[in-house]
Design a protein with these regions (language model features):
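Extracellular beta-strand-rich recognition modules
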Residues: 1, 51, 55-71, 78, ...
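Extracellular glycan-recognition surfaces and repeat-rich motifs
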Residues: 1-46, 94-130
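Extracellular/lumenal ectodomain signal focusing on beta-strand-rich modules
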Residues: 9, 53, 91, 133, ...
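Extracellular carbohydrate recognition
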Residues: 44-47, 75-77, 127, 154-174
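Extracellular beta-strand ligand-recognition surfaces/modules
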Residues: 65, 117-159
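Conserved aromatic beta-strand anchor motif in extracellular beta-sandwich/beta-rich domains
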Residues: 80-84
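Surface-exposed loop/edge segments in extracytoplasmic proteins
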Residues: 87-93
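Short, charged low-complexity linker/loop segments at the C-terminal edge of domains
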Residues: 90, 173-176
Length: 176
């Protein structure tokens, strides 16, 4: 997929006045681009990047993706969410998923206009791309799911050029 497009059916939506996810050819993990949410220093809020729905056909299904983040530690960051059969999105851990590699590394402070305030999240500096692997919840087996990456920021302080890049999503262990 060539920037500025996302793959068919993917959506990017700003929330609470945040800066939207975009595709960028700058620093992708693999060519030609990656999804990127900038970490703003003057605007709070966030952005959601969502997949289209797809079926899960195994109790052992996993999702892996490569991402890098450089955000204001403890105040700006990202989370991974799931919707099963059009139910409201919830954090992957709250839904019963398990991080097998590179799960959340901290939490986001409460009391700001950050839409993920008070939650566990990826934040700070990953120092390059890392691979996250998550086993999907058993409740997803035999169901349609939708995945979402949610980035949130407060309204001050951010690293220069900071944000969150997401690339190379792979769903494994899903029998056809």
């Amino acid at each position: 997929v060539t920037a500025p497009n996302f793959p068919a059916g993917w959506t990017a939506v700003p929330i609470l006045g945040g800066v939207n996810f975009v595709t960028t050819a700058t620093n992708p993990d693999s060519a030609p681009n990656s999804a990127f949410a900038a970490d703003p220093d003057t605007v709070g809020g966030g952005t959601d990047l969502s997949t289209p729905q797809f079926p899960i056909t195994s109790n052992s299904a996993t999702v892996s993706f490569r991402h890098k983040y450089n955000t204001e530690p403890g105040w700006d960051g990202g989370v991974f969410e799931i919707s099963i059969n059009n139910a409201p999105f919830q954090d992957i851990l709250g839904a019963g998923g398990v991080f097998l590699q590179n799960g959340y590394n901290g939490s986001i402070g409460a009391g700001t206009n950050n839409p993920i305030a008070g939650r566990q999240a990826w934040n700070g500096d990953s120092a390059g791309y890392v691979t996250t692997i998550v086993r999907l919840p058993s409740a997803a087996n035999g169901q349609n799911v939708q995945l979402k990456w949610r980035f949130g920021a407060d309204n001050n302080t951010a690293p220069v050029g900071g944000g969150w890049n997401i690339d190379n999503l792979v769903v494994s262990g899903n029998t056809q």
